[in-house]
Amino acid sequence: KKKEIRVNQWSSLGFPLLVFESETRGGILPTGRHTADAKKSGVLFSVHLKATMMKVSDPIIFGHVLRTYFQEVFQRHDATFESLGIDANDGLENLLGDLEQLPEDQAASIRKEIETAMEQGPSLAMVNSDKGITNLHVPSDIIIDASMPAMIRNSGRMWNAQGKPQDTKAVIPDSSYAGVYQATIDDCKENGALDPKTMGTVPNVGLMAQKAEEYGSHDKTFEIADPGTVRVVDQHSGEVLMEHAVSAGDIWRMCQVKDKPVRNWVELAVERARLSNTPAVFWLD
């Protein structure tokens, strides 16, 4: 089967600047071995995404993680969950709330199974230890831009169920982020903690105007239903600009850059650099 996307977003350079990212293959993330490793190592398990911005792709990835952690629960009660309209992409909190539609004895039995799975699996990093809100309760509760720097500053630890910091395994499914934080962690291991007092700071100016880059990807992000090919086609000439073979369950995402947002980005950066009297570095990969 083929899915075609017709585009007419041309840059001033005379060609479309489009970015392809394939985040999963066959809808499977290697989460199982990470949960097992976290359990064996006695560290907290955590997943770091950005569901607030990547509104299509990241809740899907979050759902895969939730299904893997509670694999036996989902396998045993899949039909019941489907009848209740439960979607793993919405998180554990939503699942627990939807169980209230069931007779109390049935709901209590499933809740007990969930508790058992959490006891037998690795301990989860907490969003709110006092209220029992885990990393897997709500997709948007842990935002990678904030959660990973905080974890690194805290020597690779997050909060456990007792409200105490504990060594943590951070799973970052999106390769765009993973390499950056891995490099940061490796540097801290070699050179010690980052210290703004001695190293200074770097203000960041994001490329965001007119839904540039990933901010405009929502209507061009798809969870692939069947194996086949995704093609990006020029709507005027019919030329195939790019194509990718995909499997069922893959997440296919396309970003875009236009001329005006880049110009706006440069203007903002230059203005910021002049006001703060700091050098400007432009990074557009």
Language-model-detected regions and their locations in the chain:
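Extended, well-ordered protein cores
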Residues: 1-10, 14-63, 72-285
